[in-house]
Amino acid sequence: MNTILPSDPARDDVLAGRPTLWLNPSYRKQAIDTSDLPVSPADVASARQNWQRLAPLLAECFPELKDTGGDIRSELVELKELREALGYRTREFGNVFIKADSHLPVAGSIKARGGVYEVFLFADSLARQKGVLVDGEDIRKLATEEARSLFSGYTVAVGSTGNLGLSVGIAARALGFKATVHMSSDAKAWKVERLRKLGVDVIQHEADYTTAVENARDIADADPTIYFVDDEQSRHLFLGYSAAASELASQLDERGITIDEENPLFLYLPCGIGGAPGGVAFGAKAIFGDNVHAFFVEPVQSPCALVHMMSGKQELVSVYDVGLTNKTEADGMAVARMSAFVAKVMREMLAGVYTAADDDLFKLLRMAWITQRQKLEPSAAAALLGPDFLLRHKEGRRFQTLNVIEEKMSQATHVLWTTGGSFVPEEQFQHFLDQAESIAAPSDRNDE
């Protein structure tokens, strides 16, 4: 279907594929208290408890988690040299950090938070259902041969552009499940190869992400031995991501950084289908309330959350419906249609969405590597633009005025959530750097 987007300061830029910032007109205070949402702050607390319960098993399955006792955590990295390079040196930019999920253990991306969580919860549920684990027993029993024998009769399946497939495949194989990952046509070859080396069955579809997910769901529905991790509808994925907010809160506290009405927090979250950024944003709202403002970032040709939420429609709108191509080098964000589940949750909770051109992503990727040795993939580099949009773009300045925070920006904290990169093979990463060097002209973004 063709969709006409409503009048909005960002509409022309969106339709032309130019970088821009869209402010959500439905954004409001205390939106997390809405009673008809499919998730609640209590669910976030339960997810944190589940992570703690699963931690001994995670440490047993993944040697890289021994030192953390099974916690999957990433560093909060202060921007120093990179801050200077990005032009965020002045006092008005407040505190600026990277939340380096690009270097998360186990899967090397933010998807470890959702994919590992859901697979391990399924293992726990299945083992209890079949009598392999009973209340009071050590969760590490799920790493024994008895449990692996049970799990080997089941397949965990998922549709993915790459990183979720890696996360789910790694987690499933670690427990002894068979694993199938349905990948879209824009999936990167190195991610396909890595999965196959783990013994994962990779099915590549000559279609985009949405179609790959639909095909995977149909196959799983017909076979009771297949458990489908549904990136479009999964509460488990969403809540697995949400627990990251408490990790961030403790890291800010350790640094003596206060988040309150006078000291706001801004999150910049790369968005594909929306589960990971939506989960993190929801978890942050559960902790910080109206003192945190979450922005998604998407490629100029794949802004699925932006076009759907701007449309104001209940029925999902895809990027194709407004004449965009869904073509981007940021494979983790090459999604034409956002999750309906996430759209409902974030309708009044998302501050806005900004878009980035592929060329800018490569330049930012190279800048992060040269200045501060942060190894990112293109989709992760998109987070680095957030403070620039908020403080220098006309819509960012309007957001400050609307929320009466102009005088508070120097006390604000900006967290740029870098979502993946450490697992990128050296040859591929060098290709990214070479591509960045070949790009000379800046993007055609209009800040006025």
From Swiss-Prot:
Catalysed conversion reaction: D-serine = pyruvate + NH4(+)
Give a yes or no for keyword Lyase in this entry. Answer: yes
Question: E.C. number, please?
Answer: 4.3.1.18
Which Pfam family, just one, is annotated for this protein? PALP
Please state what class of enzyme this protein is.
Answer: lyase
Protein's GO biological process? D-serine catabolic process; isoleucine biosynthetic process
Q: Which cofactors are named for this entry? A: pyridoxal 5'-phosphate
Keyword set includes Lyase: yes
Keywords, alphabetical? Lyase, Pyridoxal phosphate
**Record InterPro entries:** D_Ser_am_lyase, Ser/Thr_Dehydratase, TrpB-like_PALP, TrpB-like_PALP_sf
Question: What are the protein's GO molecular function terms?
Answer: D-serine ammonia-lyase activity; hydro-lyase activity; pyridoxal phosphate binding
> What family does this chain come from, according to its entry?
Belongs to the serine/threonine dehydratase family. DsdA subfamily.
Q: Quote the protein name from its UniProt record.
A: Probable D-serine dehydratase
